[in-house]
C-alpha cells in the first residue's frame, strides 16, 4: 500500500478519507469495509483479494483524481470468504458501520470490530473441529527459548522454555501453530522460516515487566506466583506478546482465559520432531491422516474429546498416579461405553461454544447446543453413579456437575430450533417475555385481521374480485380486477397498476401496515436485548462450565479408549519403577487392523542386563514394523491406554527416539545421510538410560567402511556409555559380534525362507543373528530382471572370496549363496531353522498358519 500523508488524505472524498484513516491503522491486513449490504475492499487490498478468492475487480469512481480499484462480497457471505482467506494464511480486519445514517453530511461512523487471523479463529465454520488451532509466540536468547501457545477456542494458555534448537523444533512439530509471533530482532530464522502464519512483532512487545503486568490484569491477580511461572522469564515474555496480540485482534474481553500453565519437560515422555513424524501419530509421512495411530485410536464422539486425545498422544505423561487413574477408569468404562458414548455424542463441542460465549460471539444455535448438552448431564451422572474405579472418575463426575437452573433457564428462553443468526429473529421462546409475545401476536395475527377486513370491504363495495394481499415492495394492498376497478370507492388510493389488476390502499389498511411493521421491528430489537441479557446471565457460570467441558472431554477419551480396548483386544499394561520393557505377544496397533489375515505377534524383553537388541534379517522381514510397534505400545501405556499385547510390563521411560527411514531435506539443502546423522547426533546427546531408542540401518547412506564404522560406534556408545533401551536394526552383520564384546547386548533376527525364485517372510523374531541378508531374493521378488539377479549372484560369490576387510556383508560359505535353483521344500527348510524352545504359544500358532500357507 502506498504511503499517504495527512495532507494527501485530504485530497480524497470524505468517505475515502475515512477509509484511509482506518486502513492506516491496519496496513498489514486486508480491510473488509462495510458499505450497506456489502463488504468492500479498495486499492491493493481489492487487487489481492480478487486473485485470492476469485471475486470481480472493478472500479468505484475517482478519488484524488485517480480511479479506485474495488472488489466486494455480500455481507451474508462473509464466513465463506473468510474461511478461504484464513486458509491461505491471510488476516482480515472487519470494519462495521457502528453509527446511524443521519441527514448530516459526512460518512456514517465505522470502526474495526475484530481482526480475524489464522491463530485467533473462533467461528466454527472457520475451524477444523477435531484439531487444535493455536496462536503461538516464540523468543530466543542465549539461555534458550521462551514459547507460549494460546487456544482461543478453549482458553488453554500454556508456556514452556525449550532448552535448545532440537527441543524447540519438537515443540513446533507437536503444537503446529496456525500463527507464530516472533520478535523483529530475531535474525536466525532457520527454525521457522518455512512455517505458515509467521508474524514479526516489535521487540518491545516481549518486554518482561509489560508482560507480567498484562498477565496479572488478565487473571485479576497481584502476582504470578500462584501459577508457578514467576521465574520463567523467557516464557513470560513470549506469553505477554501473545496475550497483547490476542487482545488487539479480538477487541473484546476474554474472560475464558483465566489461568496459565508452565509445562516442564520432566513431566512428560519427550519425543523429538523426528520421532513424532516417524511414528506417524497424527499424520502419516505423506501428510495425510490415513494409517496413523490416531486413525485407529480416535473413535471419540465429540470434537473436544478428539482434540484431547491427540494432546495425550503427543505428550504422554510420566505421572504414575495419572496413568493408573486412567487405567482404572478405562477398566470400569469397558462395561459402560456402549451406553455412555451415545449420550456424550449429544454434548457436542461444548468447549468451543463456551469460548464464543466468553467472546460474546455466540450465535443462537450455540445457546441451543449448551442447553442440549446440559440436558444430558443427569443421564451421565446416573449411568456412572455406581463407579467403582476410584476417586478420579468421581472427581470427573463432580466437575461435570448438573447446572439444573441454567438448563431450565435456556429451556424457557430459547426455541427448540433457533435460526442461525440473531438478525433473523425467531430465537426467544414464547412465554419468556410478555412484551415480546404481544408484539409477535400483532404481526402473527395479521391473517385473521386481514380476512375480516377483506370480507368487510367486499360486502361494503359489492366487488366479488376484491382481495387483500402483500408484497415486500408495496406492502399491504387491496386488489381489484381490471373489469371492476372503475367501481372502486373514492377512498381507495391507487398504489400499483398491473396488466389485469389494480391495487389500492386505504387509510385503515395503511395504519395497520405501519403497526405490523413497527411491531416486527420492535420485536426484533427486543429479542436482541433479551439475547444479550441472556449472555450476561450465562457468563457468571463460565468457569464452572469450562470445568465441566474439560471433564466431559476426558470422559469421552476414556470411554473411547475403553471401546478400543474391548474391540481390539487390548490389555492393561503394568507401569513400574524397574528398568524393564517386557511385552508379550505385542502387535502393531496400526498394521494389525489393516490385515486380512492374523497378525504375527512378537515379544520384546529389555532390561538393565539386556538393554540392546541387534536385529538382523531381510528387508520386508518385519524389523521396522517390530520396532515401531514396541514404541507405540510404550507410548500407549504412558497415556494410560490399554495396549495390543497379551501382557506388558514397562518401566520408567523419559524419552522415545527413532532413527527410522530418511529422505533428502530439499528445503534445507540436507542430504539423506545428513538428515540421518543429525537425528543420530540428537539421540547420542540427549538419550539416557531411561530412554527407548529405535535405530534402523544407521550408516547406509555412505561408503561401506564409513557406514559400518559409524553404526558400530553408535551402537557401542548407546550400549556401554548411555545404556539406553535400544532396538538396533542393521544389515551390517559385523555388528552381530558386539554381544561378545559388550555386556548388555543380544542378537535377534527375523527369519525368511528362499524357495526357487521366491522368498517367504516369517515375520517372527527369533534369538540369535540371521545367517544372511537375503538381498538378492528380495530384489528378485521386487521384479529385478533375472539376468541382473544372476549377475549379482556371481558378483556376490566373488566378493565373498575376498578378504573379510573388504566384504560387503558377513562372509558366507559357497553353500550359503542364494539358492535360486534349490528344490528343497520351503516347509522343510522353515522347520530346520525354527528353534521351538524360543517360541511362545502364540508365536508357534502364528508360525503354523504361515507354514500351512506355504504348502
UniProtKB/Swiss-Prot annotation:
Gene3D superfamilies: 1.10.1420.10, 6.10.140.430, DNA repair protein MutS, domain I (3.40.1170.10), MutS, connector domain (3.30.420.110), P-loop containing nucleotide triphosphate hydrolases (3.40.50.300). GO terms for molecular function: ATP binding; ATP-dependent DNA damage sensor activity; damaged DNA binding; mismatched DNA binding. Transmembrane segments: none annotated. InterPro entries: DNA_mismatch_repair_MutS, DNA_mismatch_repair_MutS-lik_N, DNA_mismatch_repair_MutS/MSH, DNA_mismatch_repair_MutS_C, DNA_mismatch_repair_MutS_clamp, DNA_mismatch_repair_MutS_core, DNA_mismatch_repair_MutS_N, DNA_mismatch_repair_MutS_sf. Pfam families: MutS_I, MutS_II, MutS_III, MutS_IV, MutS_V. This protein is involved in the repair of mismatches in DNA. It is possible that it carries out the mismatch recognition step. This protein has a weak ATPase activity. This is DNA mismatch repair protein MutS.
Amino acid at each position: 500500500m502506498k504511503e499517504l500523508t495527512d495532507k494527501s488524505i485530504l485530497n480524497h472524498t470524505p468517505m475515502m478519507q475515512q477509509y484511509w484513516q482506518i486502513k492506516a491503522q491496519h496496513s498489514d491486513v486486508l480491510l473488509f469495509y462495510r458499505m450497506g449490504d456489502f463488504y468492500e475492499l479498495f486499492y491493493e487490498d481489492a487487487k489481492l483479494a480478487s486473485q485470492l478468492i476469485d471475486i470481480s475487480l472493478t472500479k468505484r469512481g475517482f478519488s484524488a483524481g485517480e480511479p479506485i480499484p474495488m472488489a466486494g462480497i455480500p455481507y451474508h457471505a462473509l464466513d465463506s470468504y473468510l474461511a478461504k482467506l484464513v486458509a491461505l494464511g491471510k488476516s482480515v480486519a472487519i470494519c462495521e458501520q457502528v453509527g446511524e445514517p443521519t441527514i448530516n453530511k459526512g460518512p456514517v461512523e465505522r470502526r474495526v470490530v475484530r481482526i480475524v487471523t489464522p491463530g485467533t479463529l473462533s467461528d466454527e465454520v472457520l475451524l477444523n473441529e477435531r484439531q487444535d488451532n493455536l496462536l503461538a509466540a516464540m523468543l530466543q536468547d542465549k539461555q534458550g527459548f521462551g514459547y507460549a501457545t494460546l487456544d482461543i477456542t478453549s482458553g488453554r494458555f500454556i508456556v514452556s522454555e525449550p532448552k535448545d534448537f532440537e527441543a524447540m523444533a519438537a515443540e513446533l512439530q507437536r503444537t503446529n501453530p496456525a500463527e507464530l509471533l516472533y520478535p523483529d530482532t530475531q535474525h536466525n530464522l532457520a527454525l521457522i522460516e518455512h512455517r505458515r502464519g509467521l508474524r514479526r512483532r516489535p521487540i518491545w512487545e516481549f518486554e518482561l515487566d509489560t508482560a507480567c503486568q498484562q498477565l496479572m490484569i488478565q487473571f485479576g491477580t497481584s502476582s504470578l506466583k500462584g501459577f508457578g511461572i514467576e521465574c520463567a522469564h523467557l516464557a513470560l515474555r513470549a506469553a505477554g506478546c501473545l496475550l497483547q496480540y490476542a487482545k488487539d485482534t479480538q477487541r473484546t474481553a476474554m474472560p475464558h482465559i483465566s489461568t496459565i500453565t508452565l509445562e516442564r519437560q520432566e513431566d512428560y515422555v519427550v519425543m523429538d520432531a523426528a520421532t513424532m513424524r516417524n511414528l506417524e501419530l497424527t499424520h502419516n509421512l505423506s501428510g495425510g491422516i490415513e494409517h496413523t495411530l490416531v486413525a485407529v485410536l480416535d473413535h471419540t464422539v465429540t470434537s473436544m474429546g478428539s482434540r484431547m486425545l491427540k494432546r495425550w498422544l503427543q505428550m504422554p505423561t510420566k505421572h504414575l498416579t495419572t496413568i493408573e487413574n486412567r487405567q482404572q477408569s478405562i477398566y470400569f468404562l469397558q462395561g459402560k461405553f456402549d451406553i455412555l458414548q451415545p449420550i456424550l455424542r449429544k454434548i457436542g463441542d461444548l468447549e468451543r461454544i463456551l469460548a464464543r460465549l466468553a467472546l460474546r460471539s455466540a450465535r443462537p444455535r450455540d445457546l441451543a447446543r449448551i442447553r442440549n448438552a446440559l440436558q444430558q448431564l443427569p443421564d451421565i451422572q446416573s449411568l456412572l453413579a455406581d463407579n467403582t474405579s476410584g476417586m478420579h472418575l468421581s472427581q470427573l463426575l463432580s466437575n461435570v456437575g448438573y447446572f439444573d437452573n441454567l438448563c431450565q433457564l435456556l429451556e424457557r428462553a430459547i426455541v427448540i430450533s433457533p435460526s442461525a443468526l440473531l438478525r433473523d429473529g425467531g430465537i426467544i421462546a414464547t412465554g419468556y417475555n410478555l412484551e415480546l409475545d404481544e408484539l409477535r401476536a400483532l404481526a402473527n395475527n395479521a391473517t385473521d385481521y386481514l380476512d375480516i377486513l377483506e370480507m368487510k370491504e367486499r360486502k361494503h363495495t359489492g366487488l366479488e374480485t376484491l382481495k387483500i394481499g402483500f408484497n415486500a415492495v408495496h406492502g399491504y394492498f387491496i386488489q381489484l380486477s381490471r373489469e371492476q376497478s372503475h367501481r372502486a370507492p373514492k377512498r381507495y388510493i391507487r398504489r400499483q397498476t398491473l396488466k389485469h389488476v389494480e391495487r389500492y390502499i386505504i387509510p385503515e389498511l395503511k395504519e395497520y401496515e405501519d403497526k405490523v411493521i413497527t411491531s416486527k421491528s420492535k420485536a426484533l430489537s427486543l429479542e436482541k436485548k433479551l439475547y444479550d441479557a441472556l449472555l450476561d446471565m450465562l457468563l457468571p457460570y463460565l468457569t464452572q462450565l469450562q470445568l465441566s467441558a474439560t471433564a466431559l472431554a476426558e470422559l469421552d477419551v476414556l470411554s473411547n479408549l475403553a471401546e478400543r480396548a474391548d474391540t481390539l483386544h487390548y490389555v492393561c499394561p503394568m507401569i513400574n519403577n524397574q528398568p524393564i520393557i517386557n511385552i508379550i505377544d505385542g502387535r502393531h496397533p496400526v498394521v494389525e487392523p489393516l490385515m486380512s489375515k492374523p497378525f504375527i505377534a512378537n515379544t520384546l524383553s529389555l532390561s538393565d542386563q539386556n538393554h540392546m537388541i541387534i536385529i538382523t534379517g531381510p528387508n520386508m522381514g518385519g524389523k521396522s514394523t517390530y520396532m515401531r510397534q514396541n514404541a507405540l505400545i510404550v507410548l500407549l501405556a504412558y497415556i494410560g491406554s490399554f495396549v495390543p499385547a497379551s501382557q506388558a510390563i514397562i518401566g520408567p521411560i523419559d524419552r522415545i527416539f527413532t532413527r527410522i527411514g530418511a529422505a533428502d531435506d530439499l528445503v534445507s539443502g540436507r542430504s539423506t545421510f545428513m538428515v540421518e546423522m543429525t537425528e543420530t547426533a540428537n539421540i547420542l546427546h540427549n538419550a539416557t538410560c531411561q530412554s527407548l531408542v529405535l535405530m534402523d540401518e544407521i550408516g547406509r547412506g555412505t561408503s561401506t567402511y564409513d557406514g559400518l564404522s559409524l553404526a558400530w560406534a553408535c551402537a557401542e556408545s548407546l550400549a556401554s556409555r548411555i545404556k539406553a533401551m535400544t532396538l538396533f536394526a542393521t544389515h551390517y552383520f559385523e555388528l552381530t559380534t558386539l554381544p561378545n564384546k559388550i555386556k548388555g547386548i543380544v542378537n535377534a533376527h527375523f527369519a525368511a525362507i528362499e524357495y526357487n525364485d521366491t522368498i517367504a517372510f516369517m515375520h517372527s523374531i527369533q534369538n540369535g543373528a540371521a545367517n544372511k541378508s537375503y538381498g538378492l531374493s528380495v530384489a528378485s521378488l521386487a521384479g529385478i530382471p533375472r539376468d541382473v539377479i544372476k549377475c549379482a549372484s556371481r558378483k556376490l560369490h566373488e566378493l565373498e572370496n575376498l578378504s573379510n576387510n573388504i566384504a560387503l556383508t558377513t562372509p558366507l560359505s559357497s553353500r550359503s549363496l542364494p539358492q535360486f535353483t534349490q528344490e528343497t521344500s520351503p516347509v522343510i527348510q522353515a522347520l530346520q531353522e525354527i528353534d521351538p524352545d524360543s517360541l511362545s504359544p502364540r508365536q508357534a500358532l502364528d508360525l503354523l498358519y504361515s507354514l500351512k500357507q506355504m504348502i
